[in-house]
């Protein structure tokens, strides 16, 4: 279990970081755009 965790840990961390690095700014971008449109109206 220890060897498996050490082998899988970095791969999952990189993938988790990549997914969140793309998903978080996208949600923030969409939210800010919709907020700006609501405020301007």
From Swiss-Prot:
Sequence positions that bind heme: 20
GO CC, alphabetical: chloroplast thylakoid membrane; photosystem II reaction center
Membrane protein topology class: Single-pass membrane protein
GO BP annotations, alphabetical order: photosynthetic electron transport chain
Cofactor note: With its partner (PsbE) binds heme. PSII binds additional chlorophylls, carotenoids and specific lipids.
Keywords recorded for this protein, A-Z: Chloroplast, Electron transport, Heme, Iron, Membrane, Metal-binding, Photosynthesis, Photosystem II, Plastid, Thylakoid, Transmembrane, Transmembrane helix, Transport
Family statement: Belongs to the PsbE/PsbF family.
Name of protein: Cytochrome b559 subunit beta
């Amino acid at each position: 279990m220890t060897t498996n965790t050490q082998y899988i840990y970095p791969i999952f961390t990189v993938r988790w970081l990549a997914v969140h690095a793309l998903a978080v700014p996208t949600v923030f971008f969409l939210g800010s755009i919709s907020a700006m449109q609501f405020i301007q109206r």
